[in-house]
């Protein structure tokens, strides 16, 4: 027979009564009126905030974007196939935020901060709002430190400073992503945290970027945020903001960060798709009226912080894809007006074998010159002018048959300078190496070399300097092109030249 112990039963009941929670929990619940194309119309959520996260019955999360008289327009962060008409929707009382922290370095995540690289969960205790305010005027400091890309033509003529926004713009397949990836690889010795945001890219393209960064040991200081072409438009729309939130964590902790948005054209397209489905009035090229604000609020988050806030920085390299080199289209002109300069990549230059295919004539850096190293300023001061004059003369020389000697010399030097600025992919150069090559070209040391030998000479000179070390040490320590450095460089050029036939 079972022995019943009343004292035990009464103690359990007493414990249950003590733990009883009398609080009444009120949930704000609505009903799905309509769902499809990544959009849901919800009735009954009168208390919802703009931008608030909503949870559907199948655990899909959505963002309330349109607050109308009789319903709420919600964009879905999943495929929404399990959401049914008449189903319930619960407001969460939260705005979109993602986990952040050091543990994200070396990982590939989606725009919600969830890992997608199969390497397990990411341990994180901190979160940041996906859409947070940009630093104000007092919180900022003017750009004063260089961010070396390792690409000679950029560091010499279109210098980028830490905290700057420099647009990379050009047609498809002109090497835009390559410039951004090379810049990330070049930060290996610079203690810069990098974030690469792939928006609407093919998954294979993002996998290729991850592989290149892995090979070059750059993943150790890089975070990849991926919203590929098969992800919902909502994820493609918030991906850049999520990337900015991850970079901001490091920036506010006093570190230098670099963020690449590849590319903002596809983000604008995703936003246009969402806006049209939400029945917002279309404007120019069917984009909604606030597409300028879409990009300006994102790019304003890049800054060089004041010393009082730790002196961290976020440098942004947004990428824009043009159609048939049309820089005057809506999205390109918007982003050009927001950024502090642009690097324009030309299809014609790319096809003629000049890579990186940078059109120096219409590329500009508005604030970077203040951050350029003194050594580069001393040597590359007249490089842009030389190349501009050369381009003009080259166009003229196609029509003129007999050219005077001075013009022929200028054309010969320009051709050799252009050869020096050609650079293979994934092989960034240090400042000292760049200074050496430009010095050799601009001061006529290559004028009597065959054009076909210039590339080989450049490679040999870099090897010679690497074996001697003294020149690289002088420029590296002082960041100036001193008389001692010039003497050492002249000796290296002379010894390298002995292995080449002169004209």
From Swiss-Prot:
Feature type site, description Required for activity: 363
A Gene Ontology biological process noted in the UniProt record is: proton motive force-driven ATP synthesis
Q: Name the InterPro entries on file.
A: ATP_synth_asu-like_sf, ATP_synth_asu_C, ATP_synth_asu_C_sf, ATP_synth_F1_a_nt-bd_dom, ATP_synth_F1_asu, ATPase_a/bsu_AS, ATPase_F1/V1/A1_a/bsu_N, ATPase_F1/V1/A1_a/bsu_N_sf
Q: Where in the cell is it found?
A: Plastid, Chloroplast thylakoid membrane
The family database entries (CDD domains) matched by this protein are listed as: ATP-synt_F1_alpha_C, ATP-synt_F1_alpha_N, F1-ATPase_alpha_CD
Complex formation: F-type ATPases have 2 components, CF(1) - the catalytic core - and CF(0) - the membrane proton channel. CF(1) has five subunits: alpha(3), beta(3), gamma(1), delta(1), epsilon(1). CF(0) has four main subunits: a, b, b' and c.
The protein's name is ATP synthase subunit alpha, chloroplastic
């Amino acid at each position: 027979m079972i022995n019943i112990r009343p004292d035990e039963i009464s103690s359990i009941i007493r414990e249950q009564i003590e733990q009883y929670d009398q609080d009444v929990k009120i949930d704000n619940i609505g009903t799905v009126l309509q769902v499809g194309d990544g959009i849901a119309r919800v009735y009954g959520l009168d208390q919802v905030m703009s931008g608030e996260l909503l949870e559907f019955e199948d655990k899909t999360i959505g963002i309330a974007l349109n607050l109308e008289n009789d319903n709420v327009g919600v964009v879905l962060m999943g495929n929404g196939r399990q959401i049914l008409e008449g189903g319930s929707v619960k407001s969460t009382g939260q705005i979109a935020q993602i986990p952040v922290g050091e543990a994200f370095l070396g990982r590939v995540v989606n725009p919600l901060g969830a890992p997608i690289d199969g390497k397990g969960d990411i341990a994180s205790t901190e979160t940041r709002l996906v859409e947070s305010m940009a630093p104000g005027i007092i919180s900022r400091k003017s750009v004063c430190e260089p961010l070396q890309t390792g690409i000679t033509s950029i560091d010499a003529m279109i210098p980028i400073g830490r905290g700057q926004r420099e647009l990379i713009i050009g047609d498809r397949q002109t090497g835009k992503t390559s410039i951004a990836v090379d810049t990330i690889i070049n930060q290996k010795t610079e203690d810069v945290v990098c974030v690469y945001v792939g928006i609407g890219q093919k998954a294979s393209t993002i996998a290729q970027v991850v592989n290149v960064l892995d090979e070059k040991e750059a993943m150790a200081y890089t975070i990849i945020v991926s919203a590929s072409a098969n992800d919902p438009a909502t994820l493609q729309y918030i991906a850049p903001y999520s990337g900015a939130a991850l970079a901001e964590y490091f920036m506010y902790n006093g570190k230098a960060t670099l963020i690449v948005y590849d590319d903002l054209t596809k983000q604008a397209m995703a936003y246009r798709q969402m806006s049209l489905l939400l029945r917002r009035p279309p404007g120019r090229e069917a984009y909604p009226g606030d597409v300028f604000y879409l990009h300006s609020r994102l790019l304003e988050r890049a800054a060089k912080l004041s010393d009082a806030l730790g002196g961290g920085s976020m440098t942004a390299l947004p990428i824009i894809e043009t159609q048939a080199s049309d820089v005057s289209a809506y999205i390109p002109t918007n982003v050009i007006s927001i950024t502090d300069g642009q690097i324009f990549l030309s299809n014609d230059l790319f096809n003629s074998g000049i890579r990186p295919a940078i059109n120096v004539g219409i590329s500009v850096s508005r604030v970077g010159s203040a951050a350029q190293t003194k050594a580069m300023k001393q040597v590359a001061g007249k490089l842009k002018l030389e190349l501009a004059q050369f381009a003009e003369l080259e166009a003229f020389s196609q029509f003129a048959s007999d050219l005077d000697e001075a013009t022929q010399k200028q054309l010969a030097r320009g051709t050799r300078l252009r050869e020096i600025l050609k650079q293979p992919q994934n092989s960034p150069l240090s400042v000292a190496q760049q200074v050496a090559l430009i010095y050799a070209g601009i001061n006529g040391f290559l004028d009597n070399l065959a054009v076909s030998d210039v590339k080989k000479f450049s490679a040999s000179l870099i090897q010679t300097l690497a074996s001697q070390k003294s020149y690289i040490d002088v420029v590296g320590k002082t960041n100036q092109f001193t008389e001692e450095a010039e003497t050492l460089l002249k000796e290296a050029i002379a010894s390298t030249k002995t292995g080449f036939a002169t004209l």
